[in-house]
Amino acid sequence: MIKKIISFAICAFIFCLAACENEPPSIRNPIYNIVSYEDGSYLGNKGGIFLSVHFILYDENGREDIGDISLINTDYGYCWNLKNEDLEITKWGDEVYYGYSFFEYDNAESVLLGNYIIRVCDKVGNIVDSGFLVEVENYSKSIYKFDFPEYEISVKDNRKEIEIKKMKYLSCEVKFPRNLAYFKNSRKKFENEERIILSDKGLEPNTLISFRINAEPDGKLIYFLKNFRVQNEIK
């Protein structure tokens, strides 16, 4: 009996020692975007609105030590759960961010605003929380509904230039999904009131263009327009 007690005590001591040596992960600088996708845009035929959340995550034992991740709206008590392998990795500046771009609520018809917590649990049970506020400028309701703004796209100057009409925006980012040579398969940003000149020779008819619209000064509100074919010119 005494031997069993001693063995149990030793095992408990070893477990506690291991747990003490495993420092909890840390979360900092959570950032979010509210992203709306028009039917026929980046997501294909399905439109909708999603909350995108990314953050700097550090664990001294590496990413493999991270267990479950939760995003919690504390005002509504609504929770999304992710596994380690669900995390996206994005580099902004000199920092590496982890997160997820498609937190969905109400069948992608709306986004919950208000107070949020990111909760990360490592594999020995350490838990860390980080809070942040999701809001839309000049919008007072607690639920932000999907409502895609009206706009028109026209082609100018023999298919060299694109113009987006009616929609107000801070900047526009352009990508050619099926022409990888353009902009090295990345998006080129055009600031508000800057002419969107895409080619000095004129784009080929039927060229497909993807538009990302940054609508707010803080970049929190983003729209992906329906992919546009150059042949669909509006006079």
Annotate each PLM feature.
Residues 16-19:
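C-terminal motif of bacterial Sec signal peptides marking the signal peptidase cleavage site
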Residues 21-34, 128-145:
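Proline/serine/threonine-rich low-complexity linkers at boundaries of modular beta-sandwich domains
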Residues 38-58, 150-169:
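Contiguous beta-strand segments within globular domains
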Residues 60-74, 162-181:
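Solvent-exposed loop/turn segments flanking beta-strands in beta-repeat/beta-sandwich domains
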Residues 86-105, 188-199:
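Aromatic sugar-binding surface patches on proteins
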Residues 105-113, 199-208:
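Surface-exposed, short loops/turns at beta-strand junctions within beta-sandwich domains
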Residues 127-135, 219-235:
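Edge beta-strands of extracellular beta-sandwich domains
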Residues 135-157, 231-235:
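Low-complexity, Pro/Ser/Thr- and charge-rich linker/hinge segments at domain boundaries
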